[in-house]
Swiss-Prot record:
It comes from Salmonella houtenae. Changing residue 97 to R: In strain: SARC9 / s3015. One of its GO terms (molecular function) is GTPase activator activity. This is Guanine nucleotide exchange factor SopE. The keyword Methyltransferase does not apply.
Length: 240
């Protein structure tokens, strides 16, 4: 009978590492927490970026509106400048001094018209104030009439009050303002703009005609204005 001997060396049992169930569960929990943390961080980051984007857009929008407002103001200033330059050029084209140098009658009529306009402006302003306070304007009219007569203005006396024959608005203002209004009608929409350009027209006209009074017995427009203003102040100061 044959005896069989088995060698233990050929039948070794390999030891296998077995991870406990509890340890695997812990790893899954940690992984889930890590994923959740990343997700939360991403959401927070997205929220911050969104807030920054909105803030930037608001700032950009505000800056755009501010820039547009500034640009609008600049355009208004430039347009006013253009209108005034046009008025000045129109006045130069009238060539008041040139025409006056060629025609003594024209020069005399121009001086009378300018001083008569100064008379009318001062008279209207003071009379309006005196009447509003219930003051009799007859003495005032008599005194400024005498001042106008002394200045060399032609006119007529009625009810003991002298009135210049050329009393009225400055004859050069209307054509100057009208030409600018026709050229730039959008700049004469409101009364404030109209008044502003009228004041400017009067200013440049007075500067233009000033040389006509250099060699003349008549007072300059500025001197005549001061004479009438002093008379007006005397009556205004006595009002209650």
């Amino acid at each position: 009978m044959t005896k069989i001997t088995l060698s233990l060396q050929n039948f070794r049992i390999q030891k296998q590492e077995i991870t406990p169930l509890k340890e695997k569960s812990t790893e899954k929990t940690s992984l889930a927490k890590a994923i959740l943390a990343v997700k939360n961080h991403f959401n927070k980051l997205s929220s911050n970026l969104s807030e920054r984007f909105i803030s930037h857009k608001n700032t950009e929008s505000s800056a755009t509106h501010s820039h547009r407002g500034s640009a609008s103001e600049d355009r208004a200033v430039l347009t006013n400048k253009v209108v005034k330059e046009f008025m000045l050029q129109t006045l130069n084209d009238m060539d008041i001094i040139g025409n006056a140098s060629k025609d003594p009658a024209y020069a005399s009529q121009t001086r009378e018209a300018i001083l008569s306009a100064v008379y009318s402006k001062n008279k209207d302003q003071c009379c309006k104030l005196l009447i509003s306070k219930g003051i009799n304007i007859a003495p005032f009219l008599k005194e400024i009439g005498e001042a106008a007569q002394n200045a060399g203005l032609p006119g007529a006396t009625k009810n003991d009050v002298f009135t210049p024959s050329g009393a009225g608005a400055n004859p050069f203002i209307t054509p100057l303002v009208s030409s600018a209004n026709s050229k730039y009608p959008h700049m004469f929409i409101n009364q404030h703009q109209q008044a502003s350009f009228k004041i400017y027209a009067e200013k440049i006209i007075m500067t233009e005609v000033a040389p006509l009074f250099n060699e003349c017995v008549m007072p300059t427009p500025q001197q005549f204005h001061l004479i009438l203003e002093n008379i007006a102040n005397k009556y205004i100061q006595n009002t209650p």
